[in-house]
Amino acid sequence: MSNSLQSVILKTAEEKSGSRCISGCMYQVVPTIGSDGKKLLQLLPISKSSGNLIPVVQSPVMSHGLKANTEKPVQVTFQTQISSSSTSASVQLPVFQPANTTKCFFTGAIDTTGKDRVTSVRTGNFTPPVSNIQNHGVKIHKLTRQTFTIPPSTQNDSSHFIFNTPSLLPNVNSSILPSGNHLKIPAHAEVKSVLASSLPPLVQQKILGTATTSTSGTVEASQIPTVVYVHPVNSVKFVVTKKTQTIYPKPVTFNTLQIPPNVATETQLKGGQHPQAAPVNSIFQEYLQPGIPCIIPVKSSNNVATKVLNTFVGRKNLGDNTIDTPLLNTNSSGRTHSVSEPIKDNALIMFNGKVWLNEKGTCGLPSKIDQQNSVSSDIPLKDSSQLVSSSIVTEISREILNSVLVKSKSFQLKTKSLSNSQLASMANLRAEKNEKVERPSFSVTNPHTMNQSTHCLKQSKTVFINPVFPDGFRTGQNAPRKGNLVQNIEKICSSVDAATVTSQQCVFRDQESQTQYEMASIVKKEIQEKGNNKKYSQGSHTNIKASCLKNDAEFKKLFGLTKDLRVCLTRIPDHLSSGKSFNSFNSLMKSSSYKDANIVVKKEEKKQSFSKKRKAETMKMGNTKKIKIENADDTVMSIMNGTDVASSQPLSSILPTSDISQHNIVTSHSTTREDKRTEAEHCSHEKQEKGTLSSSTSFEQSTFLNKNFMEDIFPVTPPELEETIRDEKIRRLKQILREKEAALEELRKKMYQKQ
């Protein structure tokens, strides 16, 4: 038998006398053309006699197999076993079929005393009117064997049964649709009706084609269509849950419609009553292209999203057309990224009877700013092979738009139940969007400053790491003037809101707004503190006065202070702020430094043990060189008091090298004498300070009574340069003295060892 023919073989063991049945016949399926010009499959019963096939009867019943795949023959074998008993007859119907998607309908006329037994390959809840059903199944070399078992019937009837082979999942090259998975729209999915012009140019070119472009290639405003945008979508496993229904097929010609399979399709068994004279019919429905992807409507809590897909796949008046879901493949390397923001979830774009699956990372709906700078990428798109007629597309579009409107109304009802704070935040974000003012964002575009400043904006938190603010606003040493602080903070908050709207595609999140407000307030406080510290050292008195008043008002707003707080500050008189007033402070510093040096010298002397001979020699040398050491001590004091600036040279130049040991020997005497001097000076300075303070008490009171507290300024003045230089000289001289003392100690040890 040639490959272009499909055969239905009926094998029997014995035939009961006096009764006409279907045994001993082999049916040959021959493709023909009907009167209406359609392709049909005709069943020709053939009698088997001495090994030759002889056609005996031509059955008038035909099946429409327009979509049948004649390259893969299907063999259906009936094995009928009839015994002498009138109640023990049974029929087994093993069916072998290829693994592609096939739907078969069988109607059989059973003998008056016959019994049927049917077994299904799929386990399900079957409820025929006769009794329960047993089921089992096996798989052989990618072929499915199905056996149906029906309990015996006591009446003269004919059993009618239809079974649908399990729909195998088409092969789809997609990262979100692996083998065994289908698309699912979750409950929180959003269904939007957007203009086609809002899509990226690449998607417009591949999905819309020439629908939005005129002959010159420009987009006409009056012909811009709308598309349905559904996101997010997920993938689910293939689940079999649908129950069976009882139907009565008629022996007529059936049209083979290429309708996408339902996710709940399974092996079904239907039983019922039908006249006995019904002949045997075999109707095959096959898919011409089993590898075409299909949309699967899955039961979901979101009725609107489910109805959208049911609109595309649940209509029976689509004719011979089907709906494809071409994929936006994202596996191409070396593509240029579009300026439009990549979507975080999978999405569906529906237009003109086609459903496009937009995978993760591909270009989604761009924002208004991104549309102006969108760049076409090299993402390959697969065009669909078939389109739905214009009238059907119009009906589908109307139904989808109605469902979207219902969704938007329900969203408005939900917003009424929100709290006042949430509504306020949403209103602020909408106002920022309606202004259409492009504000600079925090993101750094300069490659030289990329490592210095970074801005991270995520779903639920905002991280600032040395941010670069708009209009050259920078933290640290380049802090702006205090007068522009409030305006800059407002720009920061608005730019943060604008960036959030762009990144989240106008999805309002309360957590983000709260986090951004907290971060903005923290940055504001830090900038104010840094600006205040810098202006105290650089600003003039008038600027300091204005900044202090402004800072007070801002801090009152920040901390919620409502009462007037007055801080009274008094000025120090001019005679106290002169250079003489610092003598007491300098004397205190000198005395403390000398005491520290004295303690160090005494500790070193206690640790060392000298012999009696050594002590006697030191006393003699101290008497002979007493005058020279006093002169050296006077020079050191002049350096400490700042009277002789040119005497900042090292101590080795002041003291000759020959006198180093002698100077070291009488160091204790000179330090004790200097200690007495500093203590006397300290007492005199304290007395003088008390006198000046008591004399200036009346002056300060009169100043406080005569002048207003608003005119007072901070009395803190920066240290003078001369004092800083003097302190540095003192520190260096102390270090040099310690080094020289250490060198003298080594000389003493050497001299002691030699003696």
Curated annotation (Swiss-Prot):
Localization per Swiss-Prot or TrEMBL: Chromosome; Nucleus matrix
Principal place of residence: nucleus
Pfam families per UniProt: LRIF1 (PF15741)
Keywords per UniProt: Chromosome, Coiled coil, Isopeptide bond, Nucleus, Phosphoprotein, Transcription, Transcription regulation, Ubl conjugation
Phosphoserine carried by residues: S391, S419, S425, S584
Key word Phosphoprotein present: yes
InterPro entries named in the record: LRIF1 (IPR026191)
Cross-linked residues, Glycyl lysine isopeptide (Lys-Gly) (interchain with G-Cter in SUMO2): K270, K436, K590, K687
Motif Nuclear localization signal: where in chain: 612-615, 625-628
GO function term, MF aspect, one: nuclear retinoic acid receptor binding
Compositionally skewed regions (Basic and acidic residues) per UniProt: 671-690
GO cellular component, one term: nuclear matrix
Coiled-coil ranges per UniProt: 678-711
Motif residue range(s): PxVxL motif: 565-569
Sites bearing Phosphothreonine, chain numbering: T717
Keyword field contains Ubl conjugation: yes
Domain of life from the UniProt record: Eukaryota
GO biological-process terms attached to the record: dosage compensation by inactivation of X chromosome; regulation of DNA-templated transcription
Record's comment describing the protein's domains: The Pro-Xaa-Val-Xaa-Leu (PxVxL) motif mediates interaction with HP1 (CBX1/HP1-beta, CBX3/HP1-gamma and CBX5/HP1-alpha).
Function recorded in the entry: Together with SMCHD1, involved in chromosome X inactivation in females by promoting the compaction of heterochromatin. Also able to repress the ligand-induced transcriptional activity of retinoic acid receptor alpha (RARA), possibly through direct recruitment of histone deacetylases.
Subunit structure: Interacts with RARA. Interacts with SMCHD1; leading to recruitment to inactivated chromosome X in females. Interacts (via PxVxL motif) with HP1 (CBX1/HP1-beta, CBX3/HP1-gamma and CBX5/HP1-alpha).
Family of the protein in this entry: Belongs to the LRIF1 family.
Protein name (database record): Ligand-dependent nuclear receptor-interacting factor 1
